[in-house]
Each structure stands twice: as structure tokens, then as C-alpha cells.
């Protein structure tokens, strides 16, 4: 049987790299073509694979149509994972819109330029951000829900527009897989002001990096049914990965041996609304088709993530709570991006993320933002 050719964008990013690794493990059946920016970091990362005949690296740019066309030409599958994501997307919103929408246009144009585009199956990676603010009691939803991005969220808008480009292009085989938050080792060490844009009372249904990579490989298998295509699906690692944002913060700090959120953050630092995240009524549909979940227990996965961090992160438990708090405080007050900077300097964002001055001033303790327990498995849904 002839090998299939898979073209993947964003292969040096978190999800893309996990997908590449899964495909590479199946290289007896797949030739893998990668479009990557020509940088020292990417050269170093891809060096071990450059001599492998099953891997072709195109050094280029998603915004250059000719580079995208080189990747698409002759491909059986196109996995469009690349684009700008947070935190870069938060700092450069206009560029994010331009790059994410422009790259989607280039991919579709390149597919349509093929002699028989109907033979190409294209996978677009969307985002849970497309649904916008879904705080309780409106925290359950599915892929048919309206897409209402949060205010100021150009990333979410770019994902909505890009998905529409694929859906309306007349392609015979397209699918949008809307990614949630990805649990990968580096997330335990990511520190930036956007952490405080996340309401503690909000929710998210997470996906592990391993499941996400396996998903990208599974979708390229011959046994995927025809009726899978031309739809949108939500990605998650299942009901056990449903967490409130407060619960996630607790798990993350605990994994590093750090004190609870109450001891290292002020409750006012966290926004009250205008983010994204929900729990899925249709969470299992995608796995029932593609069988990508490993069903690793949540606590075990957090322990695995910690084990993959550099050694010095394992010493985090030595830091006293007051020192951690002093380290984190500047991010809440960072000019332009910090929630506490908005309080005095950006009334539009302040209102969008807190609702009102009264709502902000009503936050007097963690009891005012700590969410009540939520039922994670609702049979009636």
C-alpha cells in the first residue's frame, strides 16, 4: 500500500509537535511534510529528522502563499495547526488576526489550486475561545452553540473567521477540531499577565498534550468514516478533565509544591468575566470516532507534567508564600495587560472584565471569588 503524505503547519508548536511525533511513529505508513519558520530554535528542534526520507521540512512562512502551496501540493492530508496563540496573541492582536486569517486563506487557496482538490482532507484546529464567556450557570455547551467571542479577544475572532473560510470554501473534506486548553509540561512554568484574565469561577474542559497529538495522527487513518467530515467538533480528554479555573489553579500550584491560591494571590487580581471556557455536552463524540484518549487520571497526568520540567522547578516548594506573591504581583499590574492596571487606566477593559466598579469593590476576600462545587457529569444533558 502506498504511503500517504501529511502536510502539517505549526509542527514546532505544542500541539503540532505532539502530532508530528505521533505521525513519525507511524512513518512506515505516512510521509510527513512540515512548514517551519527558519529559526535557530526550529533548526535545532528538527535537526534529528532532516536526514529521514519520511520527513520533509519546508523552511518558510504561513503568510507566503508559495511556501504553503509547496506543502499542500501532493499531500493527502493537510493539518493546519499553525498560527498565533496566547500569550503572543494577547500582546499583538492585530497581527494575530492578520496571520491566522491570512494563513487559513493561503491553505484553502493552495488546496483549491490542486488538480483534484476533492482527494485532499484538511483539518483545521479551532478553539474553545470561539464560544466566548460561558461562566456558570451557562457553562455547558456543544459544537452547535453560537460563537460569541469575548470583548477584545482578537484571537477568538481570528479563529471564527478562519473556520468560516474552511467551511465556506466548497472543499469536499474539511473538519474543524476546536481545541481547549492543552495540558503540557510547560504550562506549569508559564507566567504572564493573562493568568489574571481568567475568572476563578469559570470552567474549562482540558485536553492533554498526548491526546491532542494522537488525535492529529488518528484523523489521517483510512478507517475514519466519511460522515466524520464537514463538521466541527470539540476536543477534550473527557469528563475527568473538567475543572473550574480555581480548581485548576490549585492543581497547578500543588504540582509545583506551592501554597494555595489564597496564600499567593489577591482575589481582586483575577477578572470576573469576559474570558472563555465551558464544559461539553458533546465531549465524547470525537473520541467515539477517532479513539484518541488514553484516559490517564488527572492527578497522574499532573505528576507526569511536573516530572518533565527542568530540575530547578522541583525546588519551587522552597519559596515561601510571601515571596511567590511578590513575584506574581507585577504581572497583575503590568502596563497594558495587567488587570490592576486596567482598574485605573483602561475603563473599557475594566468594565469588560469586572462588570462595574461596584462588582470590583465587592471583592473583599477569596470567599467572594471562590466557586461553589459544580456537578461535572450531568446525566440529563
Which residues does each predicted region cover?
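NAD(P)H-binding glycine-rich loop region in Rossmannoid oxidoreductase-like domains
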Residues: 49-102
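Conserved beta-loop-beta element that borders a ligand/cofactor-binding pocket
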Residues: 160-186, 227
Amino acid at each position: 500500500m502506498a504511503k500517504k503524505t501529511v502536510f502539517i503547519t505549526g509542527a514546532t508548536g505544542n500541539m503540532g509537535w505532539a502530532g508530528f511525533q505521533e505521525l513519525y511513529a507511524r512513518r512506515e505508513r505516512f510521509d510527513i511534510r512540515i512548514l517551519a519558520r527558519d529559526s535557530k530554535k526550529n533548526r535545532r528542534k528538527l535537526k534529528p529528522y532532516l536526514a529521514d526520507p519520511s520527513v520533509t521540512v519546508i523552511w518558510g512562512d504561513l503568510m507566503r502563499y508559495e511556501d504553503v502551496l509547496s506543502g499542500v501540493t501532493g499531500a493527502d492530508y493537510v493539518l493546519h495547526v499553525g498560527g498565533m496563540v496566547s500569550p503572543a496573541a494577547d500582546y499583538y492582536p492585530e497581527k494575530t488576526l492578520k496571520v491566522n486569517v491570512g494563513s487559513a486563506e493561503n491553505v484553502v487557496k493552495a488546496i483549491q489550486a490542486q488538480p483534484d482538490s476533492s482527494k485532499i482532507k484538511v483539518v483545521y484546529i479551532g478553539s474553545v475561545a470561539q464560544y466566548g464567556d460561558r461562566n456558570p450557570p451557562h457553562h455547558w455547551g456543544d459544537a452547535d452553540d453560537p460563537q460569541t467571542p469575548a470583548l477584545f479577544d482578537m484571537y477568538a475572532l481570528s479563529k471564527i473567521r478562519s473556520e468560516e473560510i474552511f467551511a465556506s470554501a466548497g472543499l469536499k473534506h474539511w473538519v474543524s477540531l476546536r481545541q481547549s486548553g492543552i495540558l503540557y509540561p510547560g504550562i506549569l512554568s508559564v507566567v504572564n499577565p493573562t493568568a489574571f484574565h481568567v475568572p476563578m469561577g469559570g470552567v474549562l474542559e482540558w485536553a492533554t498534550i498526548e491526546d491532542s497529538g494522537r488525535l492529529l495522527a488518528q484523523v489521517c487513518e483510512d478507517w475514519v468514516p466519511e460522515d466524520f467530515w464537514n463538521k466541527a467538533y470539540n476536543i477534550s480528554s473527557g469528563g475527568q478533565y473538567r475543572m473550574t479555573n480555581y480548581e485548576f489553579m490549585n492543581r497547578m500550584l500543588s504540582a509545583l509544591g506551592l501554597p494555595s491560591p489564597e496564600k499567593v494571590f489577591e482575589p481582586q487580581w483575577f477578572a470576573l468575566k469576559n474570558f472563555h471556557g465551558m464544559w461539553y455536552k458533546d465531549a465524547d463524540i470525537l473520541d467515539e470516532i477517532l479513539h484518541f484518549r488514553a484516559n490517564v487520571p488527572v492527578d497522574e497526568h499532573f505528576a507526569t507534567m511536573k516530572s518533565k520540567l527542568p530540575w530547578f522547578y522541583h525546588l519551587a516548594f522552597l519559596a515561601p508564600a510571601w515571596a511567590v506573591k511578590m513575584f506574581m504581583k507585577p504581572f497583575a499590574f503590568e502596563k497594558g495587560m495587567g488587570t490592576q492596571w486596567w482598574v485605573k487606566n483602561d475603563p473599557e477593559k475594566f468594565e469588560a472584565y469586572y462588570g462595574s466598579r461596584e462588582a470590583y469593590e465587592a471583592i473583599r476576600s477569596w470567599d467572594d471569588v471562590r466557586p461553589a462545587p459544580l456537578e461535572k457529569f450531568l446525566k440529563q444533558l
